């Protein structure tokens, strides 16, 4: 009976990863995080801000209208009699109003700034896409770690039951007079150690669940363990992932920022050119004076030009800003390429780790079963049994973490290559 109980415990440990009802799919957390994660919300607000700034720049080179009005109470009114009738120069109660339409005719610097602002807004759109991919990476990391911690809790619980069964076996051997009290003490100490392992596993599970909830805005359902499996297939060649480097949202956003900085530098040079604007004003007043008309209009063409030391210094400043943007673009491009390479190599290493960990898990579980059977008949010491059980537990923990790291590495590779996890990936569950 005791041997059968131990075998059942080992079977539960070995086959915990078989398909079963589980917590919500990764897509649920990813979709929510893309809209509710603070980083995604910040990037989305940044896009709205840049679009508004683009409209501000455009508005400065488009026709505009302004109006003003005033009421004046004069202490003394002034009236002049010109023979044909009195002319009010300064009334006691004076009302004035005017409206002016301004039309920029030539503003090369303003037009260039409009183009730069539009480029910056476009870059912000790609920055939002990049931020969402980064959010997905965080969610995937938390999700698969949660599954690993969930599995570790199950394994720790199984190990505790196995340890308790070993304690009962030691107590029976002591009662039969074939084992010393030392074996019971060792078995009891092992039970307490496994209890501590289970408490630590529960803590990690709770922390992982909270981290996933904070990143995604969705509370994970922890009622049933989730499956974690990978078929150990190799990924396509590294070149297939690096081929889309220039289309990655982060790279496109950095390139757009560089182009916008260059356009701003060009706009600063255009500021050396004069600007020309036309105005048309309509004025109404209760004090027309000698004109004799309450309403008058005025049309004008205005010419503006200025030059001083700040003009040259501003050009140099904008040129330096463009150089900074180019350096940042290069850094982003290199970092993106390195991230793809790192994740691709991580997947390759994780496949080897997972394959080895699975084989080690099976061997360690078999060794633990043999040690249990041999300890029952007294052919090995209790220390041998405890060591075999600890080795089996360590092997199972290593297998769980290796599988979780592998599945996560595949997800991180696709994200590094600019592919959202909302697109299903073959071979990964």
Label each region the model flagged.
Residues 41-45, 58-62, 105-132, 182, ...:
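Sec/SRP-type N-terminal targeting helices
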Residues 1-8:
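Bacterial N-terminal signal peptides that target proteins for export
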Residues 17-20:
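N-terminal signal peptide c-region/cleavage motif recognized by signal peptidases
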Residues 132-247, 343-346, 350, 392, ...:
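Periplasmic alpha-helical coiled-coil/stalk elements that build and connect Gram-negative outer-membrane
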Residues 28-105, 127, 137, 214, ...:
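A small-residue-enriched
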Residues 75, 398-429:
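Acidic, low-complexity, intrinsically disordered peripheral segments
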Residues 174-178, 375-379, 416:
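A short glycine-centered flexible hinge/capping loop motif at secondary-structure junctions
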């Amino acid at each position: 009976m005791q041997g059968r109980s131990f075998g059942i415990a080992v079977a539960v440990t070995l086959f915990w990863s078989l398909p079963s009802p589980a917590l919500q799919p990764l897509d649920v957390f990813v979709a929510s995080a893309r809209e509710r994660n603070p980083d995604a919300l910040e990037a989305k607000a940044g896009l709205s801000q840049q679009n508004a700034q683009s409209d501000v720049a455009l508005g400065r080179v488009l026709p505009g209208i302004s109006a003003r009005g005033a009421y004046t109470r004069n202490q003394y009114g002034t009236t002049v009699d010109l023979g044909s009738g009195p002319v009010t120069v300064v009334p006691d109660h004076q009302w004035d109003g005017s409206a002016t339409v301004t039309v920029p005719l030539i503003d090369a610097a303003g037009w260039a700034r409009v183009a730069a602002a539009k480029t910056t807004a476009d870059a912000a759109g790609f920055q939002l896409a990049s931020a969402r991919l980064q959010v997905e990476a965080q969610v995937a990391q938390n999700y698969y770690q949660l599954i690993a911690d969930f599995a570790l809790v199950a394994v720790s619980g199984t190990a505790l039951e196995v340890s308790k069964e070993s304690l009962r076996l030691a107590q029976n051997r002591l009662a039969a007079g074939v084992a010393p009290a030392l074996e019971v003490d060792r078995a009891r100490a092992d039970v307490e150690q496994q209890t501590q392992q289970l408490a630590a596993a529960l803590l990690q599970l709770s922390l992982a669940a909270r981290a996933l909830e904070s990143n995604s805005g969705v509370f994970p359902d922890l009622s049933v363990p989730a499956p974690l499996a990978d078929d150990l297939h190799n990924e396509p060649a590294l070149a297939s992932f690096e081929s889309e480097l220039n289309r990655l949202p982060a790279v496109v956003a950095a390139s757009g920022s560089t182009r916008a900085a260059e356009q701003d530098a060009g706009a600063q040079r255009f500021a050396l050119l004069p600007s020309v604007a036309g105005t048309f004003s309509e004025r109404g007043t209760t004090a027309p004076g000698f004109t004799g008309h309450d309403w008058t209009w005025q049309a004008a063409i205005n010419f503006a030009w200025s030059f001083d030391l700040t003009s040259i210094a501003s050009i140099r400043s904008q040129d330096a800003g463009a150089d900074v943007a180019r350096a940042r673009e290069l850094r982003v491009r290199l970092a993106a390429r390195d991230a793809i390479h790192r994740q691709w190599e991580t997947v390759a290493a994780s496949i080897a780790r997972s394959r080895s960990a699975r084989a080690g898990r099976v061997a360690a579980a078999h060794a633990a079963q043999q040690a249990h059977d041999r300890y029952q008949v007294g052919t090995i010491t209790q220390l041998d049994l405890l060591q075999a059980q600890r080795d089996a537990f360590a092997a199972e923990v290593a297998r769980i973490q290796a599988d979780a790291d592998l599945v996560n590495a595949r997800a991180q590779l696709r994200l590094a290559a600019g592919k959202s996890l909302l697109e299903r990936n073959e071979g990964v569950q």
